[in-house]
Design a protein with these regions (language model features):
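Charge-rich, low-complexity N-terminal segments
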Residues: 1-75
């Protein structure tokens, strides 16, 4: 089963651009996913389990590197 995930990241810091760029760079490292970046969100498309795992791992990596952020995901 394929899925489309539309995800927005809202970093909890004044310098919000580096965490957003970091998220986009990290999610683009996953193979077999179609990633499309828009000004306000990133769309991840692919096989359900693979796409969900990629988003989960990317959020975890960004939390470790950039600390707190709010994520809004539409699945």
């Amino acid at each position: 089963m394929n899925v489309t995930i539309d995800i927005s990241m809202y970093p909890n810091k004044e310098d919000f651009i580096p965490p957003i760029k970091g998220f986009i760079e990290k999610i683009n490292c996953y193979e077999d996913l179609k990633i499309t970046t828009f000004p306000t969100s990133t769309v991840v498309q692919g096989e359900y389990n693979h796409a969900m795992k990629a988003v989960q791992e990317t959020i975890a990596k960004c939390y470790e590197e950039f600390n707190m952020a709010v994520y809004v995901a539409k699945i």
